[in-house]
Amino acid sequence: NNEHDNTLTDLYYDDVEMIKYQKERYVNALDKYIDLKKKFLGLDEIHMYDLYVPLVKEFDKKITFETAKKEALASVALLGQEYVEAYEKGLNSRWIDVYENEGKRSGAYSSGQRVHPFVLMNFANSLDTEFTLAHEMGHAMHSYMSTKYQAPLDRHYKIFVAEVASTCNEALLMDYLRKQSLDPKFQAYLINHFMEQFRTTLFRQCMFAEFEKIINEKTANNEVLTSDTLNQIYADLNKFYYGEDVIVDDEISMEWARIPHFYMNFYVYQYATGFSAAMALSQKLLHGTQADIEAYLSFLKSGCTKSPVELLRMAGVDMASPKPIEDAIELFDSLIDEFESIMK
């Protein structure tokens, strides 16, 4: 396990450096997205808070949980009978605490147990919470498959691979929904949702990872970290990542203080690596061969029997190379172009 953790430490440093080396491609893609936001929101200048305004308004149509279940299940049909039957059983056998309730915590979580996985979510009859269902069932099925095929000590997969299975299922649902309707407004809404995932999961989490790297190195060098120092580092990183096109208001410099993951050292970069791996694997599942599907299913069944990097390599993606992140940036770039052409 120490060997596994050392591999992840190396990968952490490699990924943060890789992002910096790719700053030009990376920032160009983000600049392009910010220009798109400015144009479609009709803004002369754009602040950090404007980035959260969707380019396409949320649909009025309410999605029932039954519809969400049906579509989420249909989107994973390509993963084969065993996966689909277990997934359907989970949807219909009370694995999920579905709706908001008084005193219930917000958000969504999955917990893998020997009896079967449990999912907590707050379904709100929206497309966003349909994607949440797909995401959490991705975690649940990863737990189910690992528990079924591995001994108790080998069934607990590492956080590094956890976000891959969940995000992969979101990508499969995205593909399924986009094929169901050619309505330009619906297509634009889905692409907007997808682009925001890239911004918040790939770009933003990499910025968080770099912030962590800087402050931990300062601590290792016996430098004192005051709130002013932390604010300055965080503000500089926002300027570095978002460029001159976005007005970085003073208030954003304190955002680091409200990110709970900073209290779980070196967690956030795994969202970015997991997202990149999931994009690569979902493309293989959708456009590859039966062998690609079998490799992915073997990965889901493997628990923690190999290091996370080896498991992902077995699934069909090499996270020790820059290619998955490069390909993810390329996909983001193509989504921006597609969105513009739809909205013309």
Model-derived regions, located:
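Contiguous, non-catalytic segments that form substrate-binding/exosite surfaces or channel walls
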Residues: N1-F118, D318
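Long, well-ordered alpha-helical segments
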Residues: N1-H4, L30-L41, G138-K148, T167-P184
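C-terminal, non-catalytic "cap/extension" segments appended to globular domains
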Residues: N2-Y13, L41-D50, L133, M141, ...
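Glycine- and acidic
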Residues: D5-I19, D50-K61, Q81-V84, R114-L127, ...
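Short amphipathic alpha-helical coiled-coil/interface segments
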Residues: I19-L30, K69, M195, L230-Y241, ...
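Conserved helix-loop functional segments at active or binding sites
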Residues: A74-E85, S111, H139, S143-A151, ...
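Active-site recognition of the HExxH zinc-binding catalytic motif
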Residues: A124-S146, S166, A171, F211, ...
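Post-HExxH zinc-binding segment in Zn-dependent metallohydrolases
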Residues: Y157-K185, F194-E196, T200, G274, ...
